[in-house]
């Protein structure tokens, strides 16, 4: 659709600009940039803006985009979260989670929502 083409082009330009900028960053600077709420929101938005609600209809339902995103992508992230739970972390354990930025909005939601975890943002761990 025209909408999908528009957003695919927009996100490609954002990714290209980000790649050009990140090449001059240290790994730490890159991780800090990726952890910024605005970056996480923008990257998660790609899943919602491109091919999500304009996907071809299946059986006239018009729900192929949401179904694919929830069945495949949300499931994948819940499995990642579950694998972390399966390590049986204790109350004093610390866990560092490094995943691709596409996973982080959902994983952050899981960790912030779970009473078993207290999330500590990377930037708060750095010495000033």
Annotate each PLM feature.
Residues 1-90, 110:
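Hydrophobic, often amphipathic alpha-helical segments used for membrane interaction and targeting
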Residues 70-128:
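A cross-kingdom marker for long, charged
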